[in-house]
Amino acid sequence: MAKPKKTPRPKAETPKGFRDYFGAEVTQRTEMLRDIAGVYHRYGFEALESSAVETVEALGKFLPDVDRPNEGVFAWQESEDDGAGDWMALRYDLTAPLARVYAQHRNDLPTPYRRYAMGPVWRNEKPGPGRYRQFYQCDADTVGSASMAADAEICAMLSDTLETVGIPRGDYVVRVNNRKVLNGVLETMGLADEGQRDAVLRTIDKFDKVGEDGVRELLGKGRLDASGAFIDGVGLSDDQAGPVLAFLTSRGADAATTVANLRAAVGASQIGVQGIDELEQIGDLLAAGGYGPDRIVIDPSVVRGLGYYTGPVYEAELTFEIFDEKGRKRQFGSVSGGGRYDDLVKRFTGQEVPATGVSIGVDRLLAALREKGRIRTAERGPVVVTVMDRDRMADYQAMVAELRNAGIRAEVYLGNPKNFGNQLKYADKRNSPVAVIEGGDERANGVVQIKDLILGAQIAANATLEEWKERPSQYEVARADLVAKVREILAEQAG
């Protein structure tokens, strides 16, 4: 008789491009987002939590490829009784949902509408080292104001946010540019062909990777990339490419010099002059608020996303050095970007609604804080009340209740209490600072044993026998003094 086939078991593994987050990481992110929300709230922004799912129609141009709605996003088509239904997708960012929310509820919302949003977004793109298909974003936007004061405020708020979470002044800079200035440069170049203009924009977007010489080559005939492959250029002459390079390299020693260089780059272009005037206005507003060039600067080399924004753009760059995976020094780089996009709601209402906002890369900012030592890499676990007699579980629950009521994180060991060594191993794996022990003898004498697990580990690793005798890591105290002694040990550990 043939043996019945075993039911195949599913593989216990995360899908490609996704990962799990455990205790300390989740706590660190939560605490950082709480600090950021505090800054946003202080600036008068209100929280918004929108659906993780939107219709593909609502996502619209925010998708990388509108002709293939399931490309770049996680999308599916609803089935209806009368046939195929709407295409739905997990949100690609937090901006597209804002456009839909404002268009849908604009009659009930104040104008301008100032909102912040935090949460995961999903992108169906090829994953790589440090690049996941689900990640957190933290956005703040002002919808309904065309004033440059809104842009200046976003820049100031971004600066305050970085300092609040632990990036000191001098270790970051918020850099500001304007898409209109680039439009003026393109106008000066006399590029009428839309395809060629788009090619120039894509080339400029690579400035931070290939530098001035690389952009010059890509604007011309082309260049060899790092792999040796030849990348075709835009095909501009040196004279045509000149204004672009002048624009990218126009930052001077101070704001006045930068502005003068930009005016030379845009010539008589009205749109270019308007963009420069807006930059000057933003600079004046920031200076009035006490935000000097040690925090926020006008920098025409900020070019990422210029094809998307319609006016001012800004980027927060961390300037301190770290070591990459090959041991080479490099700057940490950008952790946030944003800008003005005045066609945000137009696709829903047919009316242009001005808007400006910023998005913080949560995981990158967390990584930066770890590099600066601003976040504990290992979170302290709970105090563990061990179980010496399973029939006395009520007594142990009373102990843990006293600790919790005193504001101390604590738990009773709920595994098999037969092996006391396993209980201490559990406490070690939880990174617990203290273990509480009460066996039959302690119960009879009205005392408890309190073990300082942090000090005990340090003594075991470094102390001599004499030092170990002089510095005991286990204390016997009266049962009534349990909370006071635990609090004392935790305070000493906190230093």
UniProtKB/Swiss-Prot annotation:
It catalyses: tRNA(His) + L-histidine + ATP = L-histidyl-tRNA(His) + AMP + diphosphate + H(+). Its main location: cytoplasm. Keywords: Aminoacyl-tRNA synthetase, ATP-binding, Cytoplasm, Ligase, Nucleotide-binding, Protein biosynthesis. It holds the Pfam family tRNA-synt_His. The keyword Nucleotide-binding applies. GO terms for biological process: histidyl-tRNA aminoacylation. It is found in: Cytoplasm. GO terms for molecular function: ATP binding; histidine-tRNA ligase activity. It comes from the Bacteria. GO terms for cellular component: cytoplasm. Its EC number is 6.1.1.21. The keyword Ligase applies. CDD domains: HisRS-like_core, HisRS_anticodon. It is an enzyme of class 6 (ligase). Belongs to the class-II aminoacyl-tRNA synthetase family. Homodimer. This is Histidine--tRNA ligase. It comes from Ruegeria pomeroyi (strain ATCC 700808 / DSM 15171 / DSS-3).
